[in-house]
Amino acid sequence: MAAVTYELIKTCKQSGARLGKLHTPHGTIETPIFMPVGTLATVKTMSPEELKQLGAQIILSNTYHLWLRPGHDIVKEAGGLHEFMNWDRPILTDSGGFQVFSLSDLRTIEEEGVHFRNHLSGEKLFLSPEGAMEIQNALGSDIMMAFDECPPYPAERDYMRPSVERTSRWAERCLKAHKRPEDQALFGIIQGGEYEDLRRQSAQDITSLDFPGYAIGGVSVGEPKDVMNRVLEFTTPLLPANKPRYLMGVGSPDSLIDGAIRGIDMFDCVLPTRIARNGTCMTSNGRLVVRNAKYARDFRSLDENCDCHVCQTYTRAYIRHLVKCDETFGFRLTTYHNLYFLLKLMKDVRQAILDDRLLDFREEFFEQYGFNQPNAKNF
């Protein structure tokens, strides 16, 4: 039996969005779902206990960063990532490919893998599909990702075509190198940029390998949102309906809703935690930059429509004071709220799918959030 299986519960009659369950060795996940990012085996400023209070069903950790610090051998010796960080719910690890391509200016791509420099020390390193599998097998995540090439946006077709073909060959090597298929699921990644024919080629190549799940990569890399939505519209239908679909690196509220409408089941992004550390909060009425001076005497909650612990307990004025003084507690509060907001949003999305009204929900949410305004500020 596969380590991870997908169960389709319902398709929204109004939108085509999917309500489902993802069964993993560490529990069942309700989808569509947002996955908080715990890059270094921690979601910044949050404890595992708080993540459970927030409603986090699954988190993501980063292969590249854990390879460098503390080292996958140490995590393996601890009993795997779940034991190491005291998290007994599912974990997804990315392959490290995105970091190799985004953090290192000096890199050389060859058929065997990628030569690059450690972004911390400048040391020369090499990562191959086999190496990415070895690291993730040691980490022991429930879901692993194949090692892929992550092209920039925009990229010319002449660059993208051989990149897609290389990603397909690397996917085959990942499958062969994967040592724990009975308790770790390996997902394949569809690439191809904004080119429909290359996305189709990539989807055909990758789905022919019969992975237990599929990700759409190469989005949220600087392209306009209408380009991303168009890519989803012609890529998602190419993926098997009985397997989970994961949109990598996407986490703004509008993109989560629009992704679900286009058949996506899983999302991850550093956005809610990163902007929280800048004093920016997601609220039902739009973006709120709590460090701004106008909140110095504002004794309301961050979001009067939110029932999270932070909004029930602390004021904008207090949180602004903490953030302005660089107090860690302030960043803990903004992070807690932002994660709660997105996880509650996905819960509402699931309910809207169940009620066959996701398009209506989108319209209501966008109107209240301000996305329908001509000069709407997104993240």
Curated annotation (Swiss-Prot):
Organism: Halalkalibacterium halodurans (strain ATCC BAA-125 / DSM 18197 / FERM 7344 / JCM 9153 / C-125)
Catalytic reaction(s) noted: 7-aminomethyl-7-carbaguanine + guanosine(34) in tRNA = 7-aminomethyl-7-carbaguanosine(34) in tRNA + guanine
Signal peptide stretch: none
Name of the protein this chain belongs to: Queuine tRNA-ribosyltransferase
Complex formation: Homodimer. Within each dimer, one monomer is responsible for RNA recognition and catalysis, while the other monomer binds to the replacement base PreQ1.
High-level lineage: Bacteria, Bacillati, Bacillota, Bacilli, Bacillales
Cited Gene3D superfamilies: Queuine tRNA-ribosyltransferase-like
Top-level taxon: Bacteria
Residues reported to bind substrate: 94-98, 148, 191, 218
GO MF terms held by the record: metal ion binding; tRNA-guanosine(34) queuine transglycosylase activity
Cofactor note: Binds 1 zinc ion per subunit.
GO biological process: one example: tRNA-guanine transglycosylation
EC number(s) stated in the UniProt entry for this protein: 2.4.2.29
